[in-house]
Amino acid sequence: MSKEKFERTKPHVNVGTIGHVDHGKTTLTAAICTVLSKVYGGTARDFASIDNAPEERERGITISTSHVEYDTPSRHYAHVDCPGHADYVKNMITGAAQMDGGILVVAATDGPMPQTREHILLGRQVGIPYIIVFMNKCDMVDDEELLELVEMEVRELLSEYDFPGDDLPVIQGSALGALNGEEQWEAKIVELAEALDSYIPEPERAVDMPFLMPIEDVFSIQGRGTVVTGRIERGILKVGDEVAIVGIKDTTTTTCTGVEMFRKLLDEGRAGENVGALLRGTKRDEVERGQVLAKPGSITPHTKFESEVYVLSKDEGGRHTPFFKGYRPQFYFRTTDVTGDISLPEGVEMVMPGDNIQMVVELISPIAMDEGLRFAIREGGRTVGAGVVAKIFA
């Protein structure tokens, strides 16, 4: 057993608990750690250590998050749990804790509540691809029909937000019962772990995705041409590859004739590496910071999209006053700011610091984007909001 623990050859999957306040998210997190450590080995974590979540700052936004880890025989999981509702909203929108799948906790005693709905909507907006339901506190409900009713309600709610409500796994259990070592409820935690293993597909690694590198800097080197530098976000760039330069101006294609890192020439650059790419026949003034270098056809430039946005509170260094329609801030995508116009949902006149809101944004110049891309909202270089592209219109 001890040998297996140190093998990091297992696929790594990021998950997290979501759901209404007091439905048992943190208790479930503790129960998973405790039961799986008993069954498969690993470290148990108690409720208190998870509930005292440390504060972190992600893009200037204060978020309290607990990170725990656990193993099943086939996978290693990193799991996030947040103490407060506001922390979930911030976490999901900033992508501070990207999730490959979410565990939606719904108390059988209450059924779906307002935050249940809000977390499902947020999950849809920010692109959590898979949701598994853990119906908690089932030991407090004697009526089998009531349990069925709650399950049906949760499935319908998920379907309403385009999750496959009829097909996704719903596990009826008791996190507290499992934490207290009651066998029938411990078995439900193992069932949940098995559902995570089978229902959430292995995430595609960044290196296997189509190549993309945000351009941070552009140099021209006498006699060699133009070099663009940046950190490769995904995929692999090989010498000789055809690449597209996307965003801000019309898309052009060129060939990468050299890749270098720390002044050494390489055959290729991979996701996560900071490299310089030499571009054939490209002039210094044809490329700029804020564009991306990408595999041709893999990403397109857009100006108009729907987004889910969190507006920083005054305490987080955000605005002190609300903003209204007609507000024109800068939207910071990857490496650059672009001015944009916003339109607010019907019936919303103003947005207060600390709110989260859906807004449609129209940028003055196009940016390479796909759904799920994160951005910051800035005024004069100061971050006042964070958002994610939910749906592209144009």
Curated annotation (Swiss-Prot):
Residues 19-26 are annotated as: G1. One of its GO terms (molecular function) is GTP binding. It is found in: Cytoplasm. Mg(2+) binds at T26. GTP binds at residues 19-26, 81-85, 136-139. Its EC number is 3.6.5.3. Pfam families: GTP_EFTU, GTP_EFTU_D2, GTP_EFTU_D3. It catalyses: GTP + H2O = GDP + phosphate + H(+). GO terms for cellular component: cytosol. Residues 60-64 are annotated as: G2. Residues 136-139 are annotated as: G4. Residues 10-204 form the tr-type G domain. Belongs to the TRAFAC class translation factor GTPase superfamily. Classic translation factor GTPase family. EF-Tu/EF-1A subfamily. HAMAP family: EF_Tu_B (MF_00118_B). GTP hydrolase that promotes the GTP-dependent binding of aminoacyl-tRNA to the A-site of ribosomes during protein biosynthesis. Monomer. This is Elongation factor Tu 1. It comes from Vibrio vulnificus (strain YJ016).
